[in-house]
Amino acid sequence: MFIIVALMTFVIAIGGFILWPGTPDRPSKLFLSEEEIQLCRKRLQENGVEAGNTAAPILSLKLLKSIFTDWKVYLLSLWDMFFWMCDPEAYGGYLLWLKSLGRYSDSKVNLIGISAPAFGIVYVLFINFSSDLWLGRLGSIMLAQVTSIISMVILIIWNVPDSAKWFAFNIYYSNVAMSSVLYGWSNDMLRHKKEERAVTLVIMNTLSTAMKAWSGVVMFKTVEAPRFTKGYSFALANSVCVVATTFVVQHFYRKQE
Protein backbone atom coordinates (compact mmCIF):
# COMPACT_ATOMS: atom_id res chain seq x y z
CA MET A 1 0.00 0.00 0.00
CA PHE A 2 2.81 2.43 0.88
CA ILE A 3 4.52 1.65 -2.44
CA ILE A 4 1.29 2.31 -4.36
CA VAL A 5 0.73 5.59 -2.52
CA ALA A 6 4.33 6.66 -3.19
CA LEU A 7 4.00 5.87 -6.89
CA MET A 8 0.73 7.79 -7.11
CA THR A 9 2.41 10.93 -5.78
CA PHE A 10 4.65 10.93 -8.86
CA VAL A 11 1.61 10.55 -11.12
CA ILE A 12 -0.14 13.46 -9.41
CA ALA A 13 2.99 15.61 -9.52
CA ILE A 14 3.55 15.03 -13.24
CA GLY A 15 -0.15 15.43 -13.98
CA GLY A 16 -0.16 18.74 -12.14
CA PHE A 17 2.38 20.25 -14.52
CA ILE A 18 0.20 19.25 -17.46
CA LEU A 19 -3.36 19.73 -16.20
CA TRP A 20 -3.18 22.55 -13.64
CA PRO A 21 -4.45 25.75 -15.29
CA GLY A 22 -1.97 27.97 -13.49
CA THR A 23 -2.71 31.37 -11.99
CA PRO A 24 -4.31 34.49 -13.53
CA ASP A 25 -0.94 36.16 -14.09
CA ARG A 26 0.88 32.95 -15.08
CA PRO A 27 -1.72 30.77 -16.82
CA SER A 28 -1.11 27.51 -18.62
CA LYS A 29 -1.95 27.95 -22.28
CA LEU A 30 -2.10 24.23 -22.97
CA PHE A 31 -5.90 24.16 -22.58
CA LEU A 32 -6.85 27.85 -22.30
CA SER A 33 -6.97 30.25 -25.22
CA GLU A 34 -6.04 33.92 -24.83
CA GLU A 35 -9.73 34.86 -24.94
CA GLU A 36 -10.52 32.42 -22.12
CA ILE A 37 -7.67 33.77 -20.02
CA GLN A 38 -8.90 37.34 -20.45
CA LEU A 39 -12.43 36.23 -19.52
CA CYS A 40 -11.11 34.59 -16.34
CA ARG A 41 -9.26 37.76 -15.37
CA LYS A 42 -12.37 39.85 -16.04
CA ARG A 43 -14.50 37.61 -13.83
CA LEU A 44 -11.98 37.84 -11.01
CA GLN A 45 -12.06 41.63 -11.18
CA GLU A 46 -15.87 41.65 -11.20
CA ASN A 47 -15.87 39.55 -8.01
CA GLY A 48 -13.31 41.70 -6.25
CA VAL A 49 -10.54 39.11 -6.37
CA GLU A 50 -6.93 40.20 -6.62
CA ALA A 51 -5.39 38.75 -9.76
CA GLY A 52 -1.90 40.10 -9.36
CA ASN A 53 1.33 38.18 -8.84
CA THR A 54 1.33 35.08 -6.65
CA ALA A 55 4.46 35.78 -4.63
CA ALA A 56 4.44 34.58 -1.06
CA PRO A 57 3.00 37.15 1.35
CA ILE A 58 5.48 39.18 3.38
CA LEU A 59 4.58 39.15 7.06
CA SER A 60 4.34 42.58 8.59
CA LEU A 61 2.73 44.13 11.64
CA LYS A 62 0.22 45.84 9.37
CA LEU A 63 -0.77 42.54 7.78
CA LEU A 64 -1.03 40.74 11.12
CA LYS A 65 -3.06 43.59 12.59
CA SER A 66 -5.52 43.48 9.70
CA ILE A 67 -5.90 39.71 10.16
CA PHE A 68 -6.29 39.59 13.94
CA THR A 69 -8.67 42.55 14.12
CA ASP A 70 -11.06 40.87 11.70
CA TRP A 71 -13.69 38.25 12.52
CA LYS A 72 -12.68 35.83 9.78
CA VAL A 73 -9.58 34.31 11.35
CA TYR A 74 -11.43 33.54 14.59
CA LEU A 75 -14.70 32.24 13.18
CA LEU A 76 -13.16 30.25 10.33
CA SER A 77 -10.52 28.71 12.60
CA LEU A 78 -13.20 27.65 15.10
CA TRP A 79 -15.33 26.26 12.27
CA ASP A 80 -12.39 24.32 10.88
CA MET A 81 -11.44 22.90 14.29
CA PHE A 82 -14.97 21.58 14.84
CA PHE A 83 -14.84 20.03 11.36
CA TRP A 84 -11.52 18.29 11.97
CA MET A 85 -12.70 16.85 15.28
CA CYS A 86 -16.09 15.56 14.10
CA ASP A 87 -14.71 12.71 11.98
CA PRO A 88 -14.24 9.37 13.78
CA GLU A 89 -13.23 7.25 10.81
CA ALA A 90 -9.51 7.97 11.20
CA TYR A 91 -9.34 5.81 14.33
CA GLY A 92 -10.22 2.47 12.76
CA GLY A 93 -13.48 1.82 14.58
CA TYR A 94 -14.98 -0.03 11.63
CA LEU A 95 -12.04 -2.44 11.29
CA LEU A 96 -11.80 -3.00 15.03
CA TRP A 97 -15.50 -3.84 15.20
CA LEU A 98 -15.22 -6.28 12.29
CA LYS A 99 -12.27 -7.96 13.98
CA SER A 100 -14.15 -8.19 17.30
CA LEU A 101 -16.90 -10.24 15.64
CA GLY A 102 -14.49 -13.15 15.23
CA ARG A 103 -16.05 -14.14 11.91
CA TYR A 104 -13.38 -12.99 9.49
CA SER A 105 -9.67 -13.48 8.88
CA ASP A 106 -7.39 -10.42 8.95
CA SER A 107 -7.33 -10.28 5.15
CA LYS A 108 -11.13 -10.49 5.03
CA VAL A 109 -11.43 -7.71 7.62
CA ASN A 110 -9.22 -5.46 5.50
CA LEU A 111 -11.20 -6.34 2.38
CA ILE A 112 -14.60 -5.69 3.93
CA GLY A 113 -13.27 -2.52 5.56
CA ILE A 114 -12.80 -0.98 2.12
CA SER A 115 -16.55 -0.41 1.87
CA ALA A 116 -16.62 2.67 4.15
CA PRO A 117 -14.02 4.75 2.26
CA ALA A 118 -15.46 3.50 -1.04
CA PHE A 119 -18.84 4.92 -0.10
CA GLY A 120 -16.94 8.00 1.09
CA ILE A 121 -15.81 8.68 -2.47
CA VAL A 122 -19.45 8.68 -3.57
CA TYR A 123 -20.35 11.04 -0.72
CA VAL A 124 -17.57 13.45 -1.71
CA LEU A 125 -18.82 13.62 -5.30
CA PHE A 126 -22.47 13.95 -4.29
CA ILE A 127 -21.97 16.58 -1.57
CA ASN A 128 -19.71 18.76 -3.70
CA PHE A 129 -21.80 18.57 -6.86
CA SER A 130 -24.97 19.21 -4.86
CA SER A 131 -23.32 22.27 -3.32
CA ASP A 132 -22.94 23.86 -6.75
CA LEU A 133 -26.00 22.49 -8.53
CA TRP A 134 -28.73 21.86 -6.00
CA LEU A 135 -28.42 22.39 -2.26
CA GLY A 136 -25.99 25.26 -2.04
CA ARG A 137 -23.16 25.46 0.48
CA LEU A 138 -25.32 25.57 3.59
CA GLY A 139 -27.58 22.73 2.43
CA SER A 140 -24.73 20.42 1.43
CA ILE A 141 -22.95 20.93 4.77
CA MET A 142 -26.21 20.27 6.62
CA LEU A 143 -26.74 17.05 4.65
CA ALA A 144 -23.20 15.84 5.37
CA GLN A 145 -23.41 16.58 9.08
CA VAL A 146 -26.95 15.30 9.65
CA THR A 147 -25.90 12.01 8.04
CA SER A 148 -22.86 11.92 10.31
CA ILE A 149 -25.00 12.67 13.37
CA ILE A 150 -27.28 9.74 12.54
CA SER A 151 -24.21 7.51 12.31
CA MET A 152 -22.84 8.73 15.64
CA VAL A 153 -26.16 8.24 17.45
CA ILE A 154 -26.32 4.61 16.30
CA LEU A 155 -22.72 3.95 17.35
CA ILE A 156 -23.22 5.60 20.74
CA ILE A 157 -26.28 3.44 21.44
CA TRP A 158 -24.29 0.41 20.18
CA ASN A 159 -26.75 -2.25 21.39
CA VAL A 160 -28.45 -2.43 18.01
CA PRO A 161 -28.55 -5.12 15.30
CA ASP A 162 -25.31 -5.67 13.42
CA SER A 163 -27.02 -4.41 10.27
CA ALA A 164 -27.52 -1.03 11.96
CA LYS A 165 -23.82 -0.89 12.83
CA TRP A 166 -22.92 -1.76 9.23
CA PHE A 167 -25.11 1.11 8.10
CA ALA A 168 -23.60 3.53 10.62
CA PHE A 169 -20.00 2.67 9.77
CA ASN A 170 -20.66 2.95 6.05
CA ILE A 171 -22.15 6.44 6.25
CA TYR A 172 -19.74 8.01 8.71
CA TYR A 173 -17.44 9.22 5.94
CA SER A 174 -20.15 11.73 5.01
CA ASN A 175 -18.65 14.39 7.27
CA VAL A 176 -15.35 14.31 5.36
CA ALA A 177 -17.26 14.92 2.13
CA MET A 178 -17.91 18.56 3.05
CA SER A 179 -14.20 19.42 3.19
CA SER A 180 -14.10 21.07 -0.24
CA VAL A 181 -17.27 23.01 0.51
CA LEU A 182 -15.83 24.37 3.76
CA TYR A 183 -12.48 25.37 2.27
CA GLY A 184 -14.06 26.67 -0.92
CA TRP A 185 -16.40 28.86 1.11
CA SER A 186 -13.51 30.04 3.30
CA ASN A 187 -11.48 30.99 0.24
CA ASP A 188 -14.46 32.88 -1.14
CA MET A 189 -14.76 34.92 2.06
CA LEU A 190 -11.02 35.64 2.00
CA ARG A 191 -10.79 36.34 -1.72
CA HIS A 192 -10.34 40.12 -1.53
CA LYS A 193 -6.77 40.07 -0.16
CA LYS A 194 -4.52 37.19 -1.09
CA GLU A 195 -1.98 37.88 1.69
CA GLU A 196 -4.67 37.68 4.38
CA ARG A 197 -6.14 34.60 2.73
CA ALA A 198 -2.81 32.76 2.76
CA VAL A 199 -2.03 33.52 6.41
CA THR A 200 -5.58 32.83 7.60
CA LEU A 201 -5.69 29.44 5.86
CA VAL A 202 -2.37 28.49 7.47
CA ILE A 203 -3.70 29.49 10.90
CA MET A 204 -6.91 27.52 10.33
CA ASN A 205 -5.08 24.34 9.40
CA THR A 206 -2.39 24.71 12.08
CA LEU A 207 -4.89 25.10 14.92
CA SER A 208 -7.10 22.30 13.58
CA THR A 209 -4.17 19.91 13.25
CA ALA A 210 -3.04 20.71 16.79
CA MET A 211 -6.52 20.03 18.17
CA LYS A 212 -6.83 16.81 16.18
CA ALA A 213 -3.48 15.56 17.49
CA TRP A 214 -4.57 15.38 21.12
CA SER A 215 -8.30 14.77 20.76
CA GLY A 216 -7.90 11.42 19.03
CA VAL A 217 -5.50 10.11 21.66
CA VAL A 218 -7.81 11.13 24.49
CA MET A 219 -11.20 10.29 22.99
CA PHE A 220 -10.46 7.18 20.91
CA LYS A 221 -8.26 5.01 23.11
CA THR A 222 -7.60 1.65 21.45
CA VAL A 223 -8.08 -0.17 24.76
CA GLU A 224 -11.76 0.85 24.61
CA ALA A 225 -12.26 -0.79 21.21
CA PRO A 226 -14.48 -1.70 19.52
CA ARG A 227 -16.97 0.54 21.34
CA PHE A 228 -15.76 4.14 21.46
CA THR A 229 -18.69 5.65 23.35
CA LYS A 230 -16.65 8.63 24.51
CA GLY A 231 -15.13 9.16 21.08
CA TYR A 232 -18.39 8.94 19.15
CA SER A 233 -20.06 11.28 21.65
CA PHE A 234 -17.21 13.74 21.12
CA ALA A 235 -17.58 13.48 17.34
CA LEU A 236 -21.35 13.98 17.65
CA ALA A 237 -20.87 17.13 19.74
CA ASN A 238 -18.47 18.54 17.18
CA SER A 239 -20.87 17.76 14.32
CA VAL A 240 -23.55 19.75 16.13
CA CYS A 241 -21.03 22.59 16.57
CA VAL A 242 -20.22 22.47 12.85
CA VAL A 243 -23.92 22.86 12.04
CA ALA A 244 -24.34 25.77 14.47
CA THR A 245 -21.15 27.51 13.32
CA THR A 246 -22.16 27.15 9.66
CA PHE A 247 -25.24 29.29 10.27
CA VAL A 248 -23.04 31.93 11.92
CA VAL A 249 -20.63 31.80 8.98
CA GLN A 250 -23.50 32.24 6.55
CA HIS A 251 -24.74 35.30 8.48
CA PHE A 252 -21.35 37.02 8.39
CA TYR A 253 -20.80 36.01 4.76
CA ARG A 254 -24.08 37.59 3.69
CA LYS A 255 -23.25 40.69 5.71
CA GLN A 256 -19.84 40.91 4.02
CA GLU A 257 -21.27 40.47 0.53
Go through the PLM ranges and name each one.
Residues 59-129, 212-217:
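Extracytoplasmic gate region of multi-pass secondary transporters
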Residues 133-185:
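C-terminal transmembrane helical hairpin of 12-TM major facilitator-type secondary transporters
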Residues 12, 79-88, 116-120, 132, ...:
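Hydrophobic transmembrane alpha-helices of secondary-active solute transporters
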Residues 130, 186, 222-223, 231:
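Hydrophobic alpha-helical transmembrane and interfacial-helix anchor sites in secondary transporters
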Residues 3, 81, 114-118, 146, ...:
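Transmembrane alpha-helical cores of Major Facilitator Superfamily
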Residues 6-16, 80, 145, 149-152, ...:
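A generic transmembrane-helix signature of 12-TM secondary carrier transporters
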Residues 1-69, 230, 235-257:
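Central mid-sequence intracellular linker of multi-pass
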Residues 194-228, 234-238:
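A late C-terminal transmembrane helix in Major Facilitator Superfamily
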